[in-house]
Amino acid sequence: MDPNTIIEALRGTMDPALREAAERQLNEAHKSLNFVSTLLQITMSEQLDLPVRQAGVIYLKNMITQYWPDRETAPGDISPYTIPEEDRHCIRENIVEAIIHSPELIRVQLTTCIHHIIKHDYPSRWTAIVDKIGFYLQSDNSACWLGILLCLYQLVKNYEYKKPEERSPLVAAMQHFLPVLKDRFIQLLSDQSDQSVLIQKQIFKIFYALVQYTLPLELINQQNLTEWIEILKTVVNRDVPNETLQVEEDDRPELPWWKCKKWALHILARLFERYGSPGNVSKEYNEFAEVFLKAFAVGVQQVLLKVLYQYKEKQYMAPRVLQQTLNYINQGVSHALTWKNLKPHIQGIIQDVIFPLMCYTDADEELWQEDPYEYIRMKFDVFEDFISPTTAAQTLLFTACSKRKEVLQKTMGFCYQILTEPNADPRKKDGALHMIGSLAEILLKKKIYKDQMEYMLQNHVFPLFSSELGYMRARACWVLHYFCEVKFKSDQNLQTALELTRRCLIDDREMPVKVEAAIALQVLISNQEKAKEYITPFIRPVMQALLHIIRETENDDLTNVIQKMICEYSEEVTPIAVEMTQHLAMTFNQVIQTGPDEEGSDDKAVTAMGILNTIDTLLSVVEDHKEITQQLEGICLQVIGTVLQQHVLEFYEEIFSLAHSLTCQQVSPQMWQLLPLVFEVFQQDGFDYFTDMMPLLHNYVTVDTDTLLSDTKYLEMIYSMCKKVLTGVAGEDAECHAAKLLEVIILQCKGRGIDQCIPLFVEAALERLTREVKTSELRTMCLQVAIAALYYNPHLLLNTLENLRFPNNVEPVTNHFITQWLNDVDCFLGLHDRKMCVLGLCALIDMEQIPQVLNQVSGQILPAFILLFNGLKRAYACHAEHENDSDDDDEAEDDDETEELGSDEDDIDEDGQEYLEILAKQAGEDGDDEDWEEDDAEETALEGYSTIIDDEDNPVDEYQIFKAIFQTIQNRNPVWYQALTHGLNEEQRKQLQDIATLADQRRAAHESKMIEKHGGYKFSAPVVPSSFNFGGPAPGMN
């Protein structure tokens, strides 16, 4: 492999005129022996210019991520390309050195490479990585340290989320490395250069990945933990060099000194929260938690109090450092030991740290003025909450006020003082209201406060709606949102709250205010009984305002708001549904114009999904208005067409849901034209979305069977999709859905002349059973296709089975099918599946010519019926119970005081501890799908796809059919009757008698229901005579 040829090709990829030819040349060469090794040599060559090396390392990374592991292939298949072992050996030998000596831009790509190599090769093929890491870690050449630590980090990252029992190779390696890392760190502490601090930060990142989800107690004992805690405290406590203050404030968090502090605090907060809180940890950490709390928690807290003091004194503090500090302090509130140390400081922390963090800031004002849309995005970004010091401050405030005495009272006194101060700074008022709103949940449960909250709103919040300051109007809406459950004594106050919020939504000139108003208005309507009526006359302008804001802001929270409003005002929305849907469709098209790589595209995707769900909600609201639904259909089809034709995979799920909603009542000619497009999408890139397509396909089959059967191409397309799923690699859930759809078609088309399809359907389902099946659900669902065919036409099924031949299966398919079915009869769950089994068995035993295999298993048949009917009895009872369940369980008003702790009490989360132990136990056990069953009376997941036999108005009653067939057999074929019944014991005979009695009761009840439905009288409960006797011999038998 000539390196120069590859170098020239790599150089060519950077020239637009040569790129296509260069890429073709590389793609032709990439499977050659030594190609990958040569790429690594090029990447490491300092003689080459950096862009060529970068192009080489990116190509190398793509090769390793795609082609490194060996691939398993089925016998007879061609093995896919993987990197030859000779090349892999060369890469393993050299990649560590490449990472150590490469510049940052190359190194970052190489660490991705080594991550993949470790994932597939350690420890089975590459134990030498541990020796290499050990060698360079112990080297006195500090220039090697950062690179080798990046290699070690990738080793640890590969085990970060694994169960404890799977981490033994890592633990064995870290037995050697952890002491070395600690010694290196102590050695580096005196060196405050940026290179030294970068290395320190990397050691912390390794330590964090090691302990984030599992604490390896065999590695970390009290002695070495003492040393690590001292290191961590030292880093948190040390001053950052003064010259860092010359750096722009926005750039400071990226400096190594602040990053190092951030990771130190990450570790401390994680150790305390996950492993160091007695009463809140799983039992294997109980001893560690006691040690941590008594030996370390207070000492660490002291250092962190100093951090908060520095912040109070207006010294710069990186946001993540402050956030993690507050997280640690928050954990300390729950424990008497740390609380005792914290208690004298808590009021100072609330007033001097939490309060300033909760006030509107200069940075907020700058963003509001320069980019109000970005301001909205930031305030509603859940990921921002995970890293925001303001959210951490809010959490600490809530914990302290809910768990410790006097804190709430003093905090409310502080807030009240600010609110009543005549010329208070508006930003301070904003902070005070922010604090009060954050405590709403506690305040509304406390007798002393909950009655005062209405007056607080009246006196301190309502006046802010006329403030000149946008952020104060937004805060007023926000407070109403958080106090939406307040019990208004005055209707006038409730009306004022609604009117002020409505006006903000419709008339305010500032978008962040409109957004807060939209959310506040919706929660008030949902939580205040009289609110809905008040807003009813304004519903059109309210909805128009909401649609406008969604288009302007593309904010996902608002799509949730509008969905809830549509459900609240379904009648009022119906006349404007078409206008709303047009608006939403235009907004959707606007949102999806963002390319996948553009900034904010993830947020936009979530918003787009919300818009599609909103359109779906509108469809459900107008489903009884046929003419409106028809108008909506055209708009929706344009949206559906856009997504499917442009292959925007991330919206397939919502699009198929929309199409399903459009076909629930009828299937229009336009919706039938959609089926070929759905089929085409399935063939191209929609294979993995079959379960999302299923409700739509089910509608095509059941809602408009006439059209389905009017053109063979429709059934061919649906069968082809099911067949592809059953023979492909879609997974067992999708395969269950495919088999279910075949069963639905067979049942729906009984008597409709699809005899030629039955052999194809049955073969597709039973062929799947010749390959490995992991779940009983798939096994029974495939059997059920054949059972449905038996119910459709017993002779046709048996002929089909006789003609079927599967490889490696000597036994006749008929025998195998019936044996398997009877053996698995206890695996059929829910109402439909058991009913189908009963109907199938009835069809089988009622045949004039009994198949030979049935004589061999005749003793199993009635016990199978009994098992199924017992299950059906439970399933019907459960179904009736669900029907009668009233949803309006009155929630007992929680008047309880939230329980506060004494200063010497710990907050022990007993439920949480038990939950952690259950999770730990489950993590250690492999779930066995084969044996696991949910309550067998519950509806199964696939029962939602109803069939013609599940129609309650015209039921096919399995009890009556069974009884009728059994009476027929008793009279027509005494020998067969005797074969079926001779092995029954007394208990089984009694159970069969009960089934017969229940059959008569169900017939009488159904007749009564029909007469009542048609205006007749209602039967009283009938007295049902026993119709035949299972106790005696069959007629004519001696």
Curated annotation (Swiss-Prot):
Residue numbers spanned by region Disordered: 881-910
Phosphothreonine modified-residue sites: 898
Pfam families, alphabetized: Cse1, IBN_N
Listed GO CC annotations: cytosol; membrane; nuclear envelope; nuclear pore; nucleoplasm
Biased composition (Acidic residues): 884-910
Modification sites for Phosphoserine: 886, 903, 1020
GO molecular function: GTPase regulator activity; histone binding; SMAD binding; small GTPase binding
Gene3D superfamilies the UniProt entry points to: Leucine-rich Repeat Variant
Lineage: Eukaryota, Metazoa, Chordata, Craniata, Vertebrata
Keyword Protein transport: yes
Function: Functions in nuclear protein import, either by acting as autonomous nuclear transport receptor or as an adapter-like protein in association with the importin-beta subunit KPNB1. Acting autonomously, is thought to serve itself as receptor for nuclear localization signals (NLS) and to promote translocation of import substrates through the nuclear pore complex (NPC) by an energy requiring, Ran-dependent mechanism.
Subunit description: Forms a heterodimer with KPNB1. Interacts with histone H1. Interacts with H2A, H2B, H3 and H4 histones. Interacts with SNUPN and XPO1. Interacts with RPS7 and RPL5. Interacts with RPL23A (via BIB domain). Binds directly to nuclear pore complexes. Interacts with SMAD4 and NUP93; translocates SMAD4 to the nucleus through the NPC upon BMP7 stimulation resulting in activation of SMAD4 signaling. Interacts with phosphorylated SMAD2; the interaction facilitates translocation of SMAD2 to the nucleus. Interacts with SRP19.
Species per Swiss-Prot/TrEMBL record: Homo sapiens (Human)
Location(s), subcellular: Cytoplasm; Nucleus
Source species, domain of life: Eukaryota
Modification N-acetylmethionine, positions: 1
Importin N-terminal domain ranges (all copies): 22-101
Keywords: Acetylation, Cytoplasm, Host-virus interaction, Nucleus, Phosphoprotein, Protein transport, Transport
GO biological process, any: innate immune response
Similarity annotation: Belongs to the importin beta family.
Protein name: Importin-7
Gene designation per UniProt: IPO7
